[in-house]
Amino acid sequence: MARRSQSSSQGDNPLAPGYLPPHYKEYYRLAVDALTEGGPEAYNRFLASEGAPDFLCPEELEHVSRHLQPPQYVAREPPEGTPSDVDMDGSSGTYWPVNSDQAVPELDLGWPLTFGFQGTEVTTLVQPPPPDSPSIKDEARRMIRSAQQVVAVVMDMFTDVDLLSEVLEAAARRVPVYILLDEMNAQHFLDMADKCRVNLHHVDFLRVRTVAGPTYYCRTGKSFKGHLKEKFLLVDCAVVMSGSYSFMWSFEKIHRSLAHVFQGELVSSFDEEFRILFAQSEPLVPSAGALARMDAYALAPYSGAGPLVGVPGVGAPTPFSFPKRAHLLFPPPREEGLGFPSFLDPDRHFLSAFRREELQRMPGGALEPHTGLRPLARPTEAGPFGELAGPRGFFQSRHLEMDAFKRHSYATPDGAGAVENFAAARQVSRQTFLSHGDDFRFQTSHFQRDQLYQQHYQWDPQFAPARPQGLFEKLRAGRPGFADPDDFALGAGHRFPELGADVHQRLEYVPSSASREVRHGSDPAFGPSPRGLEPSGASRPNLGQRFPCQATLRQGLDTASEAEPERRGGPEGRAGLRHWRLASYLSGCHGDGGEEGLPMEAEACEDEVLAPGGRDLLPSAFRTPAAFPAKGPKPGSGSGGGDSSEREGPEETSLAKQDSFRSRLNPLIQRSSRLRSSLIFASQAEGAVGTAAATTEKVQLMHKEQTVSETLGPSGEAVRSSASAKVAELLEKYKGPARDPGGAGGAVTSSSHSKAVVSQAWREEVVAPGGAGTERRSLESCLLDLRDSFAQQLHQEAERHPGAASLTAAQLLDTLGGTDRLPSRFLSAQGRSLSPQGRDSPPPEGLGTHQLPYSEPKGNPTPAYPERKGSPTPAYPERKGSPTPAYPERKGSPTPAYPERKGSPTQAYPERKGSPTSGFPNRRGSPTTGLMEQKGSPTSTYPDRRGSPVPPVPERRGSPVPPVPERRGSLTFAGESSKTGPTEEVSSGPMEVLRKGSLRLRQLLSPKNERRGEDEGSFPTPQENGQPESPRRPSLSRGDSTEAAAEERGSRVRLASATANALYSSNLRDDTKAILEQISAHGQKHRGVPAPGPAHSSPDVGRPTTAGDLAPDMSDKDKCSAIFRSDSLGTQGRLSRTLPGSAEERDRLLRRMESMRKEKRVYSRFEVFCKKDEAGSSGAGDNLADEDTRDSKMGKFVPKILGTFKSKK
């Protein structure tokens, strides 16, 4: 009995009523074999011998003869001598297909899911149409125009240009269009596109493939295929038009045809049929000539575009590169070089090199791995990321269609196989839809594509998406730039560069820059963050999506910071950055590029200007990485930073990171101005990071080191002898002294840059074990000269304006001491405003000199200040030394602030921040209440700064706290004489505006113009305080050991930290600053203004003043400040009592501010309130609990108070 496989009628009952006898006849097969082997003659002979009728018409005979294909493996055919009926492999191609595991192409543009229908409806259309019925062509056009999800066309012949226009319009609307053409007639379609100058390769939402009829295999292995005679148009999987109508002009005009329009459940059968046909389809193959011309053209869609512009023949006209002349079909204007531009994806050309080209849809069998394949792939081998040999577009898309990849497609490691039937596909689609919900509402789940990625791309698994991605999901997600279906097509190459195997995939957890900094800090020394932000932002919801941007390395702040040093290293760059910062501060600009409102960020930038190494939020001093040492020598690199970093090494870096982390986490980071943020928060951060105790300890340690290695210089300053100690001490000295001189040398802004370079060199020299002594001597001599000139100027000032002169001295000292501490941005401003003082006007020099004595103990200050005088660089360079030279110097230098900063970047930095107010003012003895207020109330720092005409200067100093500006401002203010004038002149632009603004605020705050006099008087008074400071500085430098100076600075640092904390905890606004200034002004007013004048007037301003000396003119607070300056440790003790700690100081400040605000409800009572605040400042600790509440209230009253002041004025 015949086996089932041998009997087509097995199981059929011949006796059944509906039995249909088989029609198969053996002679049919034998006759066809004879035809294929011997031609028509053999065919006729066989029929004659069998006595059978001719069952083939002439057309069929011609078709078979014309399309007969030899066996695929010709080499295996038997030699001519062997019998033709013997198969070399012993099997027939009919039963043993060569490519049984051929991959199934996917519907890469998406396919809508349909689960139910609203009913079934069938409409019959005929051609030519009846009078009242639409024609088949019109109905087809209407259907295509209404498409929203998909247009699927199966046609034997497609040469109607009108219908082609409709299809292209749909594709231009981003409606996926699939066209399946008869393989044998596809050339006609290509010819039509060529005539219309339509480049099918650049219509993203169009897929044209070919389908052949069933293949008939002969016993010899020869075969021939039939035509695709199915004709239907499927729209949105909801409506189908099917019939005998072909998309040809003749069918509209001369042929009779029939078509039906189906809606409802019947559409599902066409849906399934189309999927089956598409799975069996092959890429569209152009003519041999066109293919040859396109070998080098695939990635160069048209002349002048794409990476292969230079490839020979690219510019030659081809069927797919049309001349630039008016379009035949669509008159509307279009883009040059592309036919039907209105139908193209708008961003298609921008990344055409990564687009899937129509050539990719050409049959892999035809192209195979020969000529056309490699030329196309070569251009992409060097992708932007060099990950893969070109975008996945060509190889990955094509390899499914190449014989080399067609085997074993079902034997995937995970056992997953391509979907074999429509039912299974539908089931998977349903499951996917249910699991993903709306994401796949308009998209067929491309489970095939997903599995194919796994199956066929196992060779590069990184390209396998976690879940299918389709056009509609992409579009619905609204991801501009990725809406191109080619990006999702399995066979289509991404228009965008592919991710390399070395690039992390999106599936991996990519920590944000913030989290990275939290874990590792933002120090550039740790290298760039693993991935950038930020351009990509949060990870895409579709983890499976592999867009190059997702894994693109980000140019993080850290990475940029490494380049920053050299880019902005120059003084000009720093000055520019400072100016910009000042401008932003004035304009109320607050968002920093990356770290929104982070105070340290702004400061880091400022410092960065000086020392690019520290790009992060941390001050450059903290951020000084290993790179800094190398860059240290460079003026732009920030010698101070380099030295500090060299000395401190990675330890410092780690500290810097911690500091950055703290500041980043700072909840109060968001401020109204970048400047204010940097000032307040830098000081706050410093205070937070390093406690006053830590600062004091560091200062003491530094002092000890200084004592050990220090020698007295000509100026009386302690000069370090030991190399390492010298380096640290010198740096510290430079920082402290440099700052002091910097404060005086308002010219530091511009010249300070140059000076910074010089001072950096000096510092480096000093750092060098051998040259330190010599450099110190020269610096000392310079300092002495400066001091002398300063004393002379002081005398002159005293004679002209006794109070002003004194004030000037104190202010100069303050300025000199605080310049370096000013934030770099203010340094520039300060330099502009003070340059006249420091450079142009002798008084500034005097100031610088006066301060120099103080700074001399540091040792570095001498060179710094002289440099400043001689060359703008020295004082500033120290700052320059590191983006925050002052910081680095602090670190490197024994000065408590700096060392502390090193020891605890936070303290050091806070010190720096607070120092402008507490530390620096005290040290500086700035006439401005900055000093006194520092002691009395950190608040005064701000008032001073405000009061000072050159508020930017303090900022410039690098210390976020305005106190530095206060000193400068005080200096300029108190010495409204020539100094003030030059300062104002110099501080043009932002600086001028700031200075004027602060003055105006003071005036507003002070109901009487008497306020100004008061301020001037106050300045002298602060000078008294400052003067004692100044003398103490000199005495510290000369009489007192460097230790004293260091301790003094440490205490100042404490004050600064406290002030910073206070300022930080209190959400200071401009109004708050005004209040602080008012408080400081009152404090100054009530302190003995006269005394400071004489002290400063006398050339001996440098001599230390005792608490008793200060007592007469100064309040206890002021005395404390003075004593603090004069007695290093004793001063610290006083400070501790006055400001038991940063917390105490902060509490005091907050208390004063709160009381001020409460009392400021009525402007007329403002002075009284200020007095009360001053009086209550000593007991600030008692009101700590109320500070928060008061602080919260400040915001409410300050605006009103300010408004009142303005209206009254």
Curated annotation (Swiss-Prot):
The ranges of region (DUF1669) come to 1-286
Looking at the keywords, is Coiled coil present?
A: no
Query: Which Gene3D superfamilies does the annotation name?
Result: Endonuclease Chain A
User: Any stretches that span the bilayer, and where are they?
Assistant: none
Q: Where is this region: Disordered?
A: 512-545, 615-664, 735-760, 829-1056, 1076-1147, 1174-1193
Point to the regions of Polar residues compositional bias.
Answer: 915-942
Give the highest taxon in the source lineage. Answer: Eukaryota
Tissue-specific expression: Expressed in tooth follicle, eye, liver and kidney.
Read off the InterPro entries from this record. Answer: FAM83 (IPR050944), PLDc_FAM83H_N (IPR041996), SACK1 (IPR012461)
Summarizing the function annotation, the protein's role is:
May play a major role in the structural organization and calcification of developing enamel. May play a role in keratin cytoskeleton disassembly by recruiting CSNK1A1 to keratin filaments. Thereby, it may regulate epithelial cell migration.
What does the subunit comment say?
Directly interacts (via DUF1669) with casein kinase isoforms CSNK1A1, CSNK1A1L, CSNK1D and CSNK1E. Interaction with CSNK1A1 recruits CSNK1A1 to keratin filaments. Interacts with KRT18 and probably other keratins.
What is this protein's record name?
Protein FAM83H
Species source reads Mus musculus
Q: Which gene encodes it?
A: Fam83h
